[in-house]
């Protein structure tokens, strides 16, 4: 591929929504028969010696939508649209086939606010540190 075509590809990928990126990830995993799970690495040196804190507080969080009762879908759908800026169709898809990541790489306070809004609408949602 030429540099120009790679730049075009990067521009196209940059324009995708979170939902579209999630779908792309699934398609690539199926096509290449791989998973996007991070490898587990055993770290013995510095952590065992006490040079690093045992558990550092994460600075980035992901908001995971785990469950939406059928009688609460419309309210949750409105909140998903509000917090993500997705169109109606994409937001509806986000509330189906759970769990789904609603937001990624967001601050702790933003993640907590988003979880609170989703829970107030009737959904089961959690914030997980990245």
Swiss-Prot record:
Keyword Glycoprotein listed: no
Spans traversing the lipid bilayer: none
Gene Ontology MF term list: mRNA binding; structural constituent of ribosome
Swiss-Prot/TrEMBL keywords: Ribonucleoprotein, Ribosomal protein
One Pfam match: Ribosomal_L12_N
GO BP field: translation
GO cellular component, one term: cytosolic large ribosomal subunit
Record carries keyword Phosphoprotein: no
Gene3D superfamilies the record matches: 3.30.1390.10, Single helix bin (1.20.5.710)
Subunit structure: Homodimer. Part of the ribosomal stalk of the 50S ribosomal subunit. Forms a multimeric L10(L12)X complex, where L10 forms an elongated spine to which 2 to 4 L12 dimers bind in a sequential fashion. Binds GTP-bound translation factors.
Functional note: Forms part of the ribosomal stalk which helps the ribosome interact with GTP-bound translation factors. Is thus essential for accurate translation.
Family: Belongs to the bacterial ribosomal protein bL12 family.
HAMAP family for the chain: Ribosomal_bL12
UniProt name for this protein: Large ribosomal subunit protein bL12
Species the sequence originates in: Chlamydia trachomatis serovar L2 (strain ATCC VR-902B / DSM 19102 / 434/Bu)
Organism taxonomic ancestry: Bacteria, Pseudomonadati, Chlamydiota, Chlamydiia, Chlamydiales
